[in-house]
Amino acid sequence: MKIVILLSGGLDSTTVLYLARSLGHDCYALSFNYGQRHKQELAAAIAVAQLAGVIQHQVISFDLGLWGGSALTDYTLDLPQNRAFKEMAEQIPITYVPARNTIFLSFALSYAEAIGATQVYAGMNAIDYSGYPDCRPDYIAAMQEVYRLGTKQGREGEPIQIITPLIDLTKPAIIQLGNRLGVPWAKTWSCYSDGGGNDPPVACGVCDSCRLRLAAFAELSLTDPLPYR
């Protein structure tokens, strides 16, 4: 089956890529250079796409930093550090990028319909949707309706399907799945910083994304292979 995968280069989307590959799908990856401060994630996406042997990897460039509204695209805003996990779950964070997943899923829909793909795979999961409005199941259901109503394939009764295989999984469960699939964790990138200009890049260890990732590995008594400050 021909599918499109939204690939950020992070832990979740890389696991989804390796899962789709294990199912025998023909994988077409789509990544974005959208003005994010953590450019290292794009380098990670390119690396894991090559390792996984995707058929095609498209990188789309545009600048959401033109209007900001997020600490990931507005460099005048500070990234949250050392936040409590309870706080992460209860509030929409300043790292939320306005309508980002709507933009990403729209590009993925266009790409999928153009190449004749039947599904779009994305890495939303239980941890994400506790804090981000565009990672929640009701949002995915609404976008699925857009896919049905807004495309030729959808109107002909064969809408492209949005597949979110991690939607009910916690971060530790995702890591366990990734280990079974042989995901190269050392090639992935989750940090909201750019790696500090180091070679190899070094994750900050204190942003929300780093803390969730580190806690998940620790819960499984595993060592995250990424270097941290």
Curated annotation (Swiss-Prot):
Gene3D superfamilies: HUPs
Catalytic activity: 7-carboxy-7-deazaguanine + NH4(+) + ATP = 7-cyano-7-deazaguanine + ADP + phosphate + H2O + H(+)
Sorted UniProt keywords: ATP-binding, Ligase, Metal-binding, Nucleotide-binding, Queuosine biosynthesis, Zinc
SUPFAM superfamilies, per the entry: Adenine nucleotide alpha hydrolases-like
Entry EC number(s): 6.3.4.20
Pathway this chain belongs to: Purine metabolism; 7-cyano-7-deazaguanine biosynthesis
GO terms for biological process, alphabetical: queuosine biosynthetic process
Keyword Ligase set for record: yes
Positions with a binding annotation for ATP: 7-17
Disulphide bond pairs: none
UniProt xrefs under InterPro entries: QueC, Rossmann-like_a/b/a_fold
GO terms of molecular function: ATP binding; ligase activity, forming carbon-nitrogen bonds; zinc ion binding
Required cofactor(s): Zn(2+)
Cofactor note: Binds 1 zinc ion per subunit.
Sequence positions that bind Zn(2+): 191, 204, 207, 210
Record keyword Ligase present: yes
NCBIfam families, per the entry: 7-cyano-7-deazaguanine synthase QueC
Family indicated by similarity: Belongs to the QueC family.
Known function: Catalyzes the ATP-dependent conversion of 7-carboxy-7-deazaguanine (CDG) to 7-cyano-7-deazaguanine (preQ(0)).
Protein name: 7-cyano-7-deazaguanine synthase
Organism: Cyanothece sp. (strain PCC 7425 / ATCC 29141)
Phylogenetic lineage: Bacteria, Bacillati, Cyanobacteriota, Cyanophyceae, Gomontiellales
Originating gene: queC
